[in-house]
Structure formats: C-alpha cells, structure tokens
Amino acid sequence: MAARQRRFHDRLEAGGLLAEVVAGLVSPPVLVLGIPRGGVVVAARVAARLGAPLDVVVPRKVGAPGNPELAVGAVAEGVQAIDEPAVRRLGLDMAEVRAEAARQTAEVARRTAAYREGLPPLVLAGRTAVLVDDGVATGWTCAAAASYTRRAGATRVVVAVPVGPVGLAERLRPVVDDVVVLVTPDPYLNVGQAYERFPQVADDEVLRCLQEGRRGVRGAQG
C-alpha cells in the first residue's frame, strides 16, 4: 500500500527505493524503460538493481487546443490514444485535437531518435517491461507507453513510479499488469511536491544514463 505523505531527497533516492519494491515483483527476462527526462534517471537505478538492460520510451501528452496543460490523450511510438468522450464533453474540435496529436507524434520520433543515438530499440518480445517515470499526473502518457510495449511483444507490463495520484493503479489496470506507486499524496498538486530536490534534467544526463544502461547488453538488441 502506498504511503500518503513522504518526500524523497531526489530522483536517485526515489529510484533506489522503487528498485527494491520492483525487485520483489519481477523475474528475468526484464527490460526497464525510462520515460524522459526525469524518469530515465529513476529508471537507471531500477535497471542497475535488477541487472536489466535500460532503454527509453517517449510518450507525449496531447493537450487540448487553447489549453495545452489539459490532457485529452497521448501518443507514443506507433500509438495514438485520444479521450474522445472528453473531447466531446469539452466541445473541442476533433480535427484540431488530431492535428495536435500528429505534431506530438512527430516530436516522439525526433526525441526517440536523439535518445537512442541511431541504435535500434532493445528487444521487448518475451520480456517483462518495467515502465518507470519520476511521477505521474494523469496517467495518459504511461498508458500510451504501456500500449507501445504491448505492441512490441512484452509478455508483462509493470508501471513503477515514486509518486502518483490516488486511484492511479485502478486507472491503469486495463492496460498494465501491475502498478507500483510509493507515495500517493492527498491532496496531489504535482510530481515535484514529493521531492526535496527536483531540478530539470538535461538531455546530456538522459543520454549518459542510457549509454551506461546499454553497456554489456548488446546481445539484447534486435
């Protein structure tokens, strides 16, 4: 059961604590996937603890036209999910929403290529996929990332995050097998409230984590 209130010193501490819980849930073969940017830092600790390879998955939120902070869907590699009931309820133009989804899909492709540095994705088929972020707000991006891992052949999908809203596990249950959330603050304002230090993560740090996570696992590539 997740704690209601606690604060992590930083992403490294959160990743270490998360790794201990995940280690009790999964067995090889496992592939850990970090969601950039901060999620890759957390994922690196999980992958190291599991002795598993580390890769990246880049979901992007689809914001409502005129209100980009309001999520009405998400995209990932080969995945597009739109909350059509919400679009209708809010009176949004579906054509504009789909145009925004297309823009975010292009950004997914650009960022994925940059983070993988020309290397192919690591093989998911027949493996347990552990999706890691530094925190979750709505769950839309995690759901899109989970759909990507299913399409890529993962036999089991686990979402693991240090912090998320109450009810996150129930929200994601239709698309994942297990959800690990260490802290569920109430009220839940934002991901950063669970951290003492929550700086922006640079792309250079993401690349360093991914490069270290790929060392010694070349045989896992397709």
Question: What residues fall within each predicted segment?
Answer:
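PRPP-associated nucleotide enzymes
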Residues: 1-222
